Regions:
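C-terminal lobe/lid and adjacent interdomain/linker elements of RecA-like ASCE P-loop ATPase modules
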Residues: 105-198
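GG-anchored amphipathic helix commonly corresponding to the ABC/SMC/Rad50 NBD signature/C-loop
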Residues: 55-58, 73-93, 117
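Walker B catalytic acidic pair
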Residues: 96-97
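Charged, surface-exposed helical/loop "interaction arms" that form contiguous linear patches used
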Residues: 1-40
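Conserved ABC ATPase signature
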Residues: 41-78, 100-104
Length: 198
């Protein structure tokens, strides 16, 4: 019962902080609630917890797993992990394709939030977003290759020129142009990286 009481007391502040993070991540009107349901005592206490969300004003909050889109789910989990990161839950945060369903300013803000998190711990992020990749301290290209009828996955660290070229490819798709290379170089400069700093 003491654990249950502490969970209840902490949940309001936790929700307030998660909503604050989500507002920064372009989700200002989201409703985020921790639902604690009383269950028979088991190894984790006497509560079952789930996150309820409503991304649309006027709609009731429902289980996150049932209503959040890919982009919403990615940003919600980033918000939750950001709030929990202060509780010393681990030295590494991993995000796989956190850019799903987002673009533009939302991707930029996700990248900034990841960079902020990386100040205190290791953050690994798989992304297809140039805005997010440009903000990373290190950039690796992950590439599948078929050799002798078998598929291999290679991981290649990129220097400044490699980053610029890969960001340009991420921006333009197949054909890299002088304009996309210039855009990629500008993205890296805005993130604080230059050819001299690599």
């Amino acid at each position: 019962k003491e654990l249950s009481s502490k969970r209840k007391n902490c949940s309001e502040e936790f929700c307030r902080r998660v909503k604050q993070e989500l507002a920064f991540l372009n989700m200002p009107g989201i409703e985020f609630v921790v639902e604690l349901e009383r269950v028979p005592l088991y190894s984790m206490g006497c509560d079952r917890m789930q996150f309820l969300v409503s991304a649309n004003r006027g709609e009731p909050a429902k289980p996150m797993s049932k209503i959040a889109s890919g982009g919403e789910l990615s940003r919600i989990m980033l918000g939750v992990k950001t709030v929990l990161s202060g509780s010393n839950l681990g030295k590494t945060m991993i995000f796989d394709e956190i850019d799903t369903g987002i673009s533009g300013s939302a991707a930029q803000k996700v990248g900034l939030k990841l960079k902020e998190a990386a100040a205190n711990r290791q953050v690994l992020c798989v992304t297809h977003s140039a805005q997010i990749a440009a903000l990373g301290n290190h950039h690796f290209l992950i590439k599948k290759e078929v050799r002798e009828g078998r598929t291999f996955t290679g991981v290649y660290p990129l220097d400044f020129e490699g980053r610029k070229r890969e960001l340009a490819r991420m921006i333009s798709g197949v054909k890299v142009t002088d304009l996309t290379l210039k855009s990629a170089e500008e993205m890296l400069a805005l993130a604080g990286f230059s050819n001299e700093s690599s």
